[in-house]
Amino acid sequence: KESPAMKFERQHMDSGSTSSSNPTYCNQMMKRRNMTQGWCKPVNTFVHEPLADVQAICLQKNITCKNGQSNCYQSSSSMHITDCRLTSGSKYPNCAYQTSQKERHIIVACEGNPYVPVHFDASVEVST
């Protein structure tokens, strides 16, 4: 069975790629990572940074998660991410996504031993 940490990696990590400006990136990746099986996952974020850098967020700024739990952490540096959003009018099984690249601080929930990311909570604008 897939562990929460492995699920996080499958759904959110894409270290090898910089998500070129490829407009079909989300359509390909959402399918490849099994997020269009049985339904179209409405929103998903991929992080284009080394896994070690994302795991290190668990040692960074501790904040409260959207659901009120206290095990969320915000990255101290901005990260290169791609947001995938289901386009309006898109219906399963033809899941179509809008691809947008961003530089954001990301917020992840961590748990376990080793203490690793298990949930992508949010991304926040880099304050200038």
Curated annotation (Swiss-Prot):
Tissues in which the UniProt entry reports expression: Pancreas.
Q: Which Gene Ontology terms describe the biological processes this protein takes part in?
A: defense response to Gram-positive bacterium
Q: Can you say where in the cell this protein is located?
A: Secreted
Q: Name one GO cellular component term.
A: extracellular region
The Basic and acidic residues compositionally biased stretches are 1-13
Coiled-coil residues are none
Residues of the region (Disordered) are: 1-26
EC number(s) from the headed UniProt entry: 4.6.1.18
Q: Where is the active site?
A: 12, 119
InterPro entries tied to this protein:
RNaseA (IPR001427), RNaseA-like_dom_sf (IPR036816), RNaseA_AS (IPR023411), RNaseA_domain (IPR023412)
Q: Where does substrate bind?
A: 7, 10, 41-45, 66, 85
* One Pfam family matching this protein: RnaseA
Annotated disulfide bonds: 26-84, 40-95, 58-110, 65-72
Question: One MF term in GO for this entry?
Answer: ribonuclease A activity
Glycan-linked positions: 34, 62
Here the segments flagged for biased composition (Polar residues) are 14-26
Q: Which UniProt keywords apply?
A: Disulfide bond, Endonuclease, Glycoprotein, Hydrolase, Lyase, Nuclease, Secreted
Catalysed reaction(s) here are: an [RNA] containing cytidine + H2O = an [RNA]-3'-cytidine-3'-phosphate + a 5'-hydroxy-ribonucleotide-3'-[RNA]; an [RNA] containing uridine + H2O = an [RNA]-3'-uridine-3'-phosphate + a 5'-hydroxy-ribonucleotide-3'-[RNA]
What family is this? Belongs to the pancreatic ribonuclease family.
Its biological purpose is as follows: Endonuclease that catalyzes the cleavage of RNA on the 3' side of pyrimidine nucleotides. Acts on single-stranded and double-stranded RNA.
What does the subunit section of this Swiss-Prot or TrEMBL entry state?
A: Monomer. Interacts with and forms tight 1:1 complexes with RNH1. Dimerization of two such complexes may occur. Interaction with RNH1 inhibits this protein.
* Protein name (Swiss-Prot/TrEMBL): Ribonuclease pancreatic
Instruction: Tell me what organism the protein belongs to.
Output: Equus caballus
Q: Which gene encodes it?
A: RNASE1
